[in-house]
């Protein structure tokens, strides 16, 4: 029994980058950085069971659009239920890798990511996939747009700064989450 629990826990951390769903404190910390007073095109990456999705749907205007990118189809029932419960909102679910979705330049005002970036590190390839993912997010973000990312360890900040070509706008710490998390906020400047 303990071995099964350990294996499930290890799989969750390795594949999904989480132990349990994000706490309301982490959700509020990230979502509060978004200005919902105007119509937005939002991309949520790595929705899981929808902790952030629920809050984004609640706060976004009817004129806003939410695209959800979740590679793992096992989470579809939770997300589809949220979409069905909000027929007045413009929401689309995409089951693909973020690098496949973000081919159009400057499409999004906000990109909110729950991707476990630390899991994409591969020293043998100089972190090629990690950089491809971060570059795709920068490519898909409009000039002046906001990229939000949380990490359980203060990692990958320099990778994000390298791709965006500037220092992080803000880094905050949310202790009331399992695991405690760092929230990164980065705006895109003109190239």
State the predicted function of each range.
Residues 143-151:
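Conserved beta-strand signature within the Rossmann-like core of class I S-adenosyl-L-methionine
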Residues 2-37:
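Class I SAM-dependent methyltransferase Rossmann-like catalytic core
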Residues 72-74:
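Conserved SAM/SAH-binding beta-strand->alpha-helix loop
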Residues 153-191:
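Class I S-adenosyl-L-methionine
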Residues 50-54:
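Glycine-rich SAM-binding Motif I of class I
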Residues 127-143:
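A short glycine-rich, Lys/Arg-flanked "PGG" loop and its adjoining helix->strand segment in the class I
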């Amino acid at each position: 029994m303990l071995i099964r629990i350990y294996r499930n826990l290890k799989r969750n951390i390795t594949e999904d980058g989480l132990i349990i769903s994000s706490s309301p404190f982490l959700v509020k910390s990230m979502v509060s950085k978004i200005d919902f007073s105007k119509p937005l095109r939002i991309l949520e990456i790595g929705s899981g069971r929808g902790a952030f999705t629920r809050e984004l749907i609640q706060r976004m205007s009817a004129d806003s659009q939410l695209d959800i990118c979740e590679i793992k189809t096992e989470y579809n029932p939770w997300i589809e239920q949220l979409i069905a419960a909000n027929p007045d909102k413009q929401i689309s679910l995409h089951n693909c890798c973020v690098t496949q979705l973000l081919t159009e330049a400057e499409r999004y005002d906000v990109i909110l990511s729950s991707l476990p970036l630390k899991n994409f590190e591969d020293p043998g390839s100089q972190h090629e996939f990690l950089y491809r993912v971060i570059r795709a997010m920068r490519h898909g973000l409009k000039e002046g747009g906001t990229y939000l990312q949380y990490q359980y360890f203060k990692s990958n900040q320099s990778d994000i700064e390298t791709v965006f070509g500037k220092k992080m706008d803000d880094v905050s710490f949310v202790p009331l989450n399992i695991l405690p998390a760092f929230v990164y906020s980065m705006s895109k400047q003109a190239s």
